[in-house]
Every structure is written in C-alpha cells, then in structure tokens.
Swiss-Prot record:
GO terms for molecular function: ATP binding; ligase activity, forming carbon-nitrogen bonds; zinc ion binding. Catalyzes the ATP-dependent conversion of 7-carboxy-7-deazaguanine (CDG) to 7-cyano-7-deazaguanine (preQ(0)). Zn(2+) binds at residues 194, 202, 205, 208. Its EC number is 6.3.4.20. The gene is queC. Pathway: Purine metabolism; 7-cyano-7-deazaguanine biosynthesis. Keywords: ATP-binding, Ligase, Metal-binding, Nucleotide-binding, Queuosine biosynthesis, Zinc. This is 7-cyano-7-deazaguanine synthase. It comes from Prochlorococcus marinus (strain MIT 9313).
C-alpha cells in the first residue's frame, strides 16, 4: 500500500470513478502508466468501454483487456443474471451479493504478472473506504497481507525491490474522490459505475446512489438518476 513513486505503474482500470482517479494520480506523478482491465463475465460491456475511453483520454502507454471468466461459476449478482442486483443499500456487517468471489485476488495477481513483465514497480488500485465496509478483498488488512505475499511470490520481491500495491484512496470517501477527480481533470462523464447493464445508468443500485450523493455534494449535475429515461 506504499505511496512511493516509481517510474512505471500498472493501473487496474475498471472504468469506474475510483480506478480512474487512482490512475490519474499516477499520471500526475509523472509515471509511465499501463492500464489493465478485465472482461470477467460481468453483466455488461459499459465499464470496459469506459475503461478504454479513459485509457485513451489519459494517454496511457498501453491498455490491456484480459478475459477471466469468473461468471462461469456465478456466485455474484454481477456475473449471474439469475440473481437480482440489490437496490436497498448495503446492510452493515453483511457482504452484498454484488461481491464477486475472489475477484480482486485474481486481478491483483494478474496485475503483478504484468508488472514483472514490464519491469514496473507499482500497482495502483482504486480501493477506498466505501468498499471495505462490504467487501472483504478491499480492506487495508487484505492489502497488507497481499503485499506480504507479493514480496515472497515474485522475482522482484525476492531480489529486494518488490512491486508495491498502492491504494491512494484507501481512506477516502466518495465525496473526497469526486473532489480529487475534479482537481485532476478526470472526465467523470466517461466513467461508468452502475452495476446494471443498459444504455443508461439505473440510478437505483448502491453504486449509482453512492456516486450520485457524492456528485450532488460536489455540485455536479451529471447524476446516474438523471440519465435514466
């Protein structure tokens, strides 16, 4: 979780506001940033289209989209169309059905592989405080444990210059992330946060509601709820 600056950074780019802001911080720091996105069997293509647009906007040197079909075995409303995406909000202490089993563990592992292949020293993640209340693989202790594993599991770590997992937004709420995105010039209109598919954001899923509240506080009018016909 180090914020140490290195010459090359791999950015896990989902297409959402959080990962876009994290990637933009690496770009601002003067890094050569390589984007990495995943087609993991999610409900829709909108977030991958957003990731591609964001990578182009930020001028990333490379943008890889890797197919890892976590939807093959379901286990989440984001990959299993027979499950309903909840609209009632997150219940404290309950992991929502939007949690995708093992998703971040798999994504970070592939990110570390790309980082080694490109001699990158850093992996930047958009994980933040709004995530780890519900998702076990978004918590600070998870990242610390993964960092220890990464230092043991790859050549760079064994040689004493391990690849750092950088989560610059880890203690931030969504309002702070929106404010930082605006400062960095992140094209918020190009990001996609909605859990559901369709031409327009649903405006009612938990992701849309959290995003809308933060955008509204920041004085923005481009709300998910207003994009719904």
């Amino acid at each position: 979780m180090s914020s140490m600056i290195h010459s090359t950074t791999i950015a896990l780019l989902s297409g959402g506001l959080d990962s876009a802001t994290a990637a933009a911080l690496a770009v601002e720091a003067g890094q050569k940033v390589i984007g990495l996105s995943f087609d993991y069997g999610q409900r829709h293509r909108k977030e991958l289209q957003a990731a591609d647009a964001l990578a182009a906007h930020m001028g990333l040197s490379e943008h890889h989209v890797i197919s890892v079909n976590l939807g093959s075995w379901g286990g989440s409303s984001l990959t299993d169309l027979t499950q309903t995406v909840p609209s009632e909000g997150v219940v404290d202490g309950v992991i929502p059905n939007t949690y995708v089993p093992g998703r971040n563990t798999v994504f970070i592992a592939i990110g570390l592989s790309l980082a080694e292949a490109r001699n990158a020293n850093q992996l930047v993640l958009g994980i933040n405080a709004m995530d780890y209340s519900g998702y076990p693989d978004c918590r600070p202790d998870y990242l610390r444990a993964y960092q220890s594993l990464a230092d043991l599991a790859n050549k760079a770590g064994r040689e004493g210059h391990g690849i750092k997992l950088w989560a610059p937004l880890i203690d931030w709420n969504k309002k702070q992330i929106v404010q930082e995105a605006l400062r960095l010039g992140v094209p918020i209109d190009k990001t996609w946060s909605c859990y559901s598919g369709g031409d327009h954001a649903c405006g009612i899923c938990d992701s849309c509601r959290i995003r809308d509240a933060a955008l509204s506080e920041a004085g923005r009018s481009d709300l998910c709820s207003k994009s719904t016909p």
